Amino acid sequence: MKEGIHPEYREVVFMDVQTGNKFVTRSTIHTRETVEIDGKTYPLFKCDVTSESHPFYTGAQTRIVETGRVEKFRARFARTAGTVKSAS
């Protein structure tokens, strides 16, 4: 591999903005903010959504029940199914 063309792969702190949870992982992301954890300074990246706050992972997911096009068609067809237009 060529020297100097690859981004720096380092430990970075990702913080969930909604819950405030922080976790350290490795990444090549660039950020200006830093945070100190256990006496060591890490770059800080703030995330809007992580597995700590996303409804799919927390179990707080609510399903939106919305009538689709097929159901709307069937409802409309059911109302008019009994009435047949007579040919004059």
Curated annotation (Swiss-Prot):
<dbReference type="InterPro" id="IPR027493">
    <property type="entry name" value="Ribosomal_bL31_B"/>
</dbReference>
<comment type="similarity">
    <text>Belongs to the bacterial ribosomal protein bL31 family. Type B subfamily.</text>
</comment>
<dbReference type="InterPro" id="IPR042105">
    <property type="entry name" value="Ribosomal_bL31_sf"/>
</dbReference>
<dbReference type="GO" id="GO:0003735">
    <property type="term" value="F:structural constituent of ribosome"/>
</dbReference>
<dbReference type="InterPro" id="IPR034704">
    <property type="entry name" value="Ribosomal_bL28/bL31-like_sf"/>
</dbReference>
<dbReference type="GO" id="GO:0005840">
    <property type="term" value="C:ribosome"/>
</dbReference>
<keyword id="KW-0687">Ribonucleoprotein</keyword>
<dbReference type="Pfam" id="PF01197">
    <property type="entry name" value="Ribosomal_L31"/>
</dbReference>
<dbReference type="InterPro" id="IPR002150">
    <property type="entry name" value="Ribosomal_bL31"/>
</dbReference>
<dbReference type="GO" id="GO:1990904">
    <property type="term" value="C:ribonucleoprotein complex"/>
</dbReference>
<dbReference type="GO" id="GO:0006412">
    <property type="term" value="P:translation"/>
</dbReference>
<keyword id="KW-0689">Ribosomal protein</keyword>
<comment type="subunit">
    <text>Part of the 50S ribosomal subunit.</text>
</comment>
<protein>
    <recommendedName>
        <fullName>Large ribosomal subunit protein bL31B</fullName>
    </recommendedName>
</protein>
